[in-house]
Amino acid sequence: MSSYERRRFLTVLVALPLVACGFTPAYAPGGPAAGLLDRVLVDAPTDKNGFDLVERLEERLGRTNAPAYRISYAIKTTVEGQGITTTNAVTRFRISGTIDFALIDNATDAVLSRGTVGSFTSYSASGTPVSTVSSEADANTRLMRLLADQIVTRLIATSGQWNQE
């Protein structure tokens, strides 16, 4: 058996259990999360963190003109010093964030899915004031992207329970 044939055989062997258990890709036609794409409107942002969150959610779910669902959210962030020098100067900060979110059916206003996601990022404050401000802004953007990805993952994972299309 050649190397190519062996790889093909192993690929088929790995795929068989997935087919046997009824595995369907989430975004496939008829898949549980297919109804999310280009059908979700995210509440308008009110600050930079909200803008970064909405931008990432729209990247992942698409921007819609005819929304079937709406995502509402509340962002909470805290900043704490992590790296402290012998002169009590903070050189590293940690930004922790949580988002409470709800997926709402536009037709009925029923809450289809809700949850809380959380994560953290860090940034260095040991450079110039300009680099510190830039690092902080980048850390906040990274945090919102992480949290948006967690929201989308949660919606995909639960879509089989609430998406009846």
Can you say where each PLM-predicted feature lies in the sequence?
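C-terminal/domain-edge helix-coil "capping" segments
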Residues: S134-E165
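Bacterial Sec signal peptide processing site at the extreme N-terminus
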Residues: V19-D38
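Acidic/histidine-rich, surface-exposed loop or edge segments in extracytoplasmic proteins
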Residues: A34-P45, G127-S131
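N-terminal export leaders
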Residues: R6-T11
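Post-signal-peptide N-terminal segment of Sec-exported extracytoplasmic proteins
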Residues: D43-A74
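Surface-exposed short loop/turn segments
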Residues: T64-R114, S122-D138, R145
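Sec/Tat-exported extracytoplasmic proteins
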Residues: L61-N65, L103, A107, Q150-S159
